[in-house]
């Protein structure tokens, strides 16, 4: 199924226009339905170790394939990936740390954490990470975690944020504007019969990382 998704997206990348998409709409609808089924299976299996996402519906986690081109110089109408975000306080629009799957030709990945937090949440996350830095680093330094998710991703400030010492040992962590880690995968990873078993194990490694971040997010959202 995932091989068919990648093939469809490869063709879409070469024919990113409404005429081609409409001619292949039934094919897209069938693949999207299959992807929804896969994401629901992931949710149900992740919920066995992260019960906070139990009851989440896959359809609420999938991102639209249609691009917002209103303010973009790139006027191609469609995204060239299938993706879903599974988090405890909702689906794709959630501010909570969660689990992300992304299928794209030569750009597949699994990811987790908090991406693009609003300023107030970013400030709160930095504060809690700074005050509990040893615990945070210990999570990321565990061998299995570090092997799967080598570094944090996203934009990094050139200088330390205001209010923090410039000689802080883990300055790069605090300079991040996102607290997200990524495991890049070859397309073939998702073609294997046991890909979901492996993905669930990779997501399981994220649980302590997400749990740490969600302590802050829950306070920010007034969920505690």
Predicted segments, located by residue:
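Extended cationic-aromatic binding surfaces that line active-site or macromolecule-binding grooves
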Residues: 34-89
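Aromatic- and glycine-enriched beta-alpha-beta binding-site module
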Residues: 70-130
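Aromatic/basic-lined ligand-recognition segments
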Residues: 65, 158-171
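Charge-rich, low-complexity terminal tails
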Residues: 168-224
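A generic structural signal for short, non-catalytic loop/turn and secondary-structure boundary residues
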Residues: 55-58, 77-79, 94, 150, ...
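Short His/Asp/Glu-rich catalytic/ion-coordination signatures at enzyme active sites or charged loops
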Residues: 1-30, 181-195
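Contiguous, amphipathic alpha-helical segments that mediate oligomerization or scaffolding
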Residues: 4, 14-49, 201-220
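Compact, glycine/acidic-enriched structural inserts
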Residues: 105-164
């Amino acid at each position: 199924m995932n091989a068919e998704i990648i093939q469809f997206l490869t063709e879409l990348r070469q024919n990113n226009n409404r005429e081609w998409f409409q001619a292949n709409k039934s094919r897209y609808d069938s693949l999207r339905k299959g992807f929804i089924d896969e994401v629901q299976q992931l949710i149900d299996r992740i919920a066995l170790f992260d019960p906070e996402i139990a009851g989440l519906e896959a359809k609420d986690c999938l991102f639209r394939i249609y691009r917002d081109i209103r303010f973009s110089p790139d006027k191609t109408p469609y995204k060239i990936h299938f993706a879903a975000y599974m988090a405890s306080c909702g689906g794709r629009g959630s501010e909570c740390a969660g689990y992300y799957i992304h299928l794209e030709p030569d750009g597949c990945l699994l990811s987790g954490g908090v991406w693009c937090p609003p300023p107030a949440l970013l400030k709160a996350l930095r504060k809690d990470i700074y005050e509990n830095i040893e615990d945070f680093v210990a999570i990321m330094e565990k061998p299995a975690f570090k092997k799967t998710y080598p570094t944090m991703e996203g934009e990094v400030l050139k200088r330390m944020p205001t209010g923090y010492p410039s000689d802080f040992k883990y300055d790069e962590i605090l300079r991040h504007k996102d607290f997200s880690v990524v495991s890049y995968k070859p397309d073939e990873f998702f073609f294997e019969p046991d890909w979901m078993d492996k993905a669930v194990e990779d997501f399981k490694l994220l649980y302590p990382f997400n749990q740490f971040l969600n302590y802050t997010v829950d306070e920010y959202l007034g969920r505690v």
